[in-house]
A protein has these predicted regions:
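Conserved mixed alpha/beta catalytic, RNA-binding, or beta-rich assembly cores of soluble enzyme
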Residues: 1-65, 85-88, 102, 110, ...
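Mid-chain, well-packed structural core segment of small domains
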Residues: 59-94
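Short beta-alpha junction loops
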Residues: 77-81, 108-113
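Alpha-helix-loop-beta-strand connector modules within alpha/beta enzyme cores
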Residues: 96-103
């Protein structure tokens, strides 16, 4: 039997009441940033918020997730699509990789179409760095619409 891939998910604190429905649906369906786990068994070993700007919980939550076997940390799609998107997301990515040596993935569920439309109007993601950040969750329009 293949060993489970254990992951942690960090969401934006402004969504602290989020039940994770889109994240867990996309994990089950292997959509968005979870498509990387196609044909793999995955276990979520941690799900928490950053604790609000500037993200003080990131330092401690990742350590706990590692203690539960996490090999990858997903910075949830809410950090990417919020208005405004998280100003600390690239720092979180670099910090987790550097301090813990874990794989860090931008996003969880596919970007909903309504967010893509608005961010395109705003020009939010025109920068090459943002183009890299949205890539794992930028799926086809039909799928994006199911996440609206």
């Amino acid at each position: 039997m293949e060993e489970k891939t254990k992951i942690g998910i960090i969401i934006c604190d402004r969504y602290h009441r989020c039940a994770g429905g889109k994240c867990f649906r996309s994990l089950r369906n292997r959509e968005g940033a979870f498509s990387r786990y196609k044909d793999m068994e995955v276990e979520v070993v941690g799900y928490t918020t950053c604790d609000g700007c500037p993200g003080g919980n990131v330092e401690y939550a990742v350590e706990e997730m590692m203690g539960n076997g996490a090999k990858a940390i997903h910075l949830a799609t809410g950090l990417v699509v919020g208005y405004p998107p998280c100003p600390h997301i690239t720092y979180f990515y670099d910090f987790i990789k550097t301090k813990y040596g874990l794989e860090v993935v931008y996003g969880t569920h596919p970007i909903p179409q309504k967010y893509l439309t608005m961010h395109n109007k705003l020009g939010t993601w025109n920068d090459p760095t943002w183009q890299e950040i949205i890539q794992p969750t930028l799926v086809d329009e039909k799928t994006r619409l199911t996440y609206d």
